[in-house]
Curated annotation (Swiss-Prot):
<feature type="binding site">
    <location>
        <begin position="76"/>
        <end position="77"/>
    </location>
    <ligand>
        <name>substrate</name>
    </ligand>
</feature>
<keyword id="KW-0963">Cytoplasm</keyword>
<dbReference type="GO" id="GO:0062192">
    <property type="term" value="F:L-rhamnose mutarotase activity"/>
</dbReference>
<feature type="binding site">
    <location>
        <position position="41"/>
    </location>
    <ligand>
        <name>substrate</name>
    </ligand>
</feature>
<keyword id="KW-0119">Carbohydrate metabolism</keyword>
<dbReference type="InterPro" id="IPR008000">
    <property type="entry name" value="Rham/fucose_mutarotase"/>
</dbReference>
<feature type="binding site">
    <location>
        <position position="18"/>
    </location>
    <ligand>
        <name>substrate</name>
    </ligand>
</feature>
<dbReference type="InterPro" id="IPR011008">
    <property type="entry name" value="Dimeric_a/b-barrel"/>
</dbReference>
<feature type="region of interest" description="Disordered">
    <location>
        <begin position="85"/>
        <end position="104"/>
    </location>
</feature>
<comment type="pathway">
    <text>Carbohydrate metabolism; L-rhamnose metabolism.</text>
</comment>
<comment type="similarity">
    <text>Belongs to the rhamnose mutarotase family.</text>
</comment>
<comment type="subunit">
    <text>Homodimer.</text>
</comment>
<keyword id="KW-0684">Rhamnose metabolism</keyword>
<feature type="active site" description="Proton donor">
    <location>
        <position position="22"/>
    </location>
</feature>
<dbReference type="GO" id="GO:0005737">
    <property type="term" value="C:cytoplasm"/>
</dbReference>
<dbReference type="InterPro" id="IPR013448">
    <property type="entry name" value="L-rhamnose_mutarotase"/>
</dbReference>
<protein>
    <recommendedName>
        <fullName>L-rhamnose mutarotase</fullName>
        <ecNumber>5.1.3.32</ecNumber>
    </recommendedName>
</protein>
Length: 104
């Protein structure tokens, strides 16, 4: 299992809306994530800095990357575009984090 962590941001006035849209996420999105080998997916909000920290365990990098090509993911990105900075393809602006420490 590969561990991935990343940081995104959310607009300062959109914290509550971001959380509302994730609780619960669309069932079809949860299904796509699981079917593509995503496990233990969490997102944490740092309200003071408007940062989102994501963590997910994936079965393979290729399967994780394939999620972006699904219709439901494309629709989700559009749905979230008004609450967070996005790339021209509507994907959230995201930076991978380097692992520093792990205790099993």
């Amino acid at each position: 299992m590969l561990r991935k962590a990343f940081v995104m941001s959310v607009f300062p006035d959109s914290h509550d809306e971001y959380q509302r849209r994730h609780n619960p996420i669309w069932p079809e999105l949860a299904e796509v994530l699981k079917n593509h080998g995503a496990h233990h997916y969490s997102i944490f909000l740092d309200k003071q800095r408007n940062l989102l920290f994501g963590y997910v365990e994936v079965e393979s990098e290729a399967r994780w990357e394939a999620i972006a090509q699904t219709d439901v993911c494309q629709r989700w990105w559009k749905h979230m575009g008004d609450v967070m900075p996005s790339n021209p393809d509507n994907s959230p602006i995201s930076d991978a984090l380097d692992p520093v420490f792990y205790l099993d």
